[in-house]
């Protein structure tokens, strides 16, 4: 698969870049995507939720009313789950939500997500980002030139670039990621992907089947 390469002014440079078909042109596996996104979301959870059960509450254990004869429901002490302010039955306990997936499935999910983006023409390739100093205004102009300024966009960089990061961090709907850290969730969470030529080379090398 070939895509045109644009400059930061949004102009077609006439150059082409090759996207590896084993990454960007496979038949997407929706179930692999589902499992990988589910794992990503689960791994973000802290799992620190906690509600006190009956044995953990302080307070009197005196029975509030006698067992029979009142005409009302039976009830025990003030911590009874039947009462307002009482304990909770089977409340949440601290737990670890993380789970593992095998590497082949995660790789398939990542390639499936990238193939969806390529199939929907949601991948843009630019020559490079050159910033001598952090300039949010300049980065915003690039987004406008590429016509992605009103959409959620993920910029894929080949390496850490402090000036690019500082220029983009305050822009809404704009995220940055290193090419070697691309994952299924971040790809699908954005409408468009913007890669540099070097980013494409990194992705082609690391993720080819």
From Swiss-Prot:
InterPro entries referenced in this protein's UniProt entry, alphabetically: Ribosomal_uL4, Ribosomal_uL4-like, Ribosomal_uL4_dom_sf
Top-rank lineage group of the source organism: Bacteria
Record-level Gene Ontology MF annotations: rRNA binding; structural constituent of ribosome
Protein name per Swiss-Prot or TrEMBL: Large ribosomal subunit protein uL4
Assigned protein family: Belongs to the universal ribosomal protein uL4 family.
Region annotation (Disordered) ranges: 45-80
PANTHER family linked to this entry: 50S RIBOSOMAL PROTEIN L4, LARGE RIBOSOMAL SUBUNIT PROTEIN UL4M
Protein function: One of the primary rRNA binding proteins, this protein initially binds near the 5'-end of the 23S rRNA. It is important during the early stages of 50S assembly. It makes multiple contacts with different domains of the 23S rRNA in the assembled 50S subunit and ribosome. Forms part of the polypeptide exit tunnel.
Entry coiled-coil feature ranges: none
GO cellular component: ribonucleoprotein complex; ribosome
Gene Ontology BP annotations: translation
Subunit note: Part of the 50S ribosomal subunit.
Key words of the record: Ribonucleoprotein, Ribosomal protein, RNA-binding, rRNA-binding
Organism from which the protein derives: Porphyromonas gingivalis (strain ATCC 33277 / DSM 20709 / CIP 103683 / JCM 12257 / NCTC 11834 / 2561)
């Amino acid at each position: 698969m070939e895509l045109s390469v644009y400059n930061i002014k949004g102009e077609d440079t006439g150059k082409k870049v090759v996207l590896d078909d084993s990454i960007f042109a496979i038949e997407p596996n929706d179930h692999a995507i589902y499992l990988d996104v589910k794992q990503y979301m689960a791994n973000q959870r802290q799992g620190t939720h906690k509600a006190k059960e009956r044995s953990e509450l302080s307070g009197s254990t005196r029975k509030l009313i006698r067992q029979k004869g009142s005409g009302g429901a039976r009830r025990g002490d003030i911590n009874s789950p039947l009462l307002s302010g009482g304990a909770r039955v089977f409340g949440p306990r601290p737990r670890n939500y993380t789970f593992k997936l095998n590497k082949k499935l995660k790789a398939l999910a990542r390639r499936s997500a990238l193939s969806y983006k390529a199939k929907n023409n949601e991948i843009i390739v630019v020559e490079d980002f050159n910033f001598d100093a952090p300039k949010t205004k300049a980065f915003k102009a690039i987004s406008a030139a590429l016509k992605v300024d009103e959409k959620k966009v993920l910029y894929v960089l080949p390496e850490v670039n402090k000036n690019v990061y500082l220029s983009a961090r305050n822009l809404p709907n704009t995220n940055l990621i290193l090419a070697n850290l691309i994952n299924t969730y971040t790809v699908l969470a954005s409408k468009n992907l913007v890669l540099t030529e070097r980013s494409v080379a990194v992705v082609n090398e690391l993720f080819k089947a």
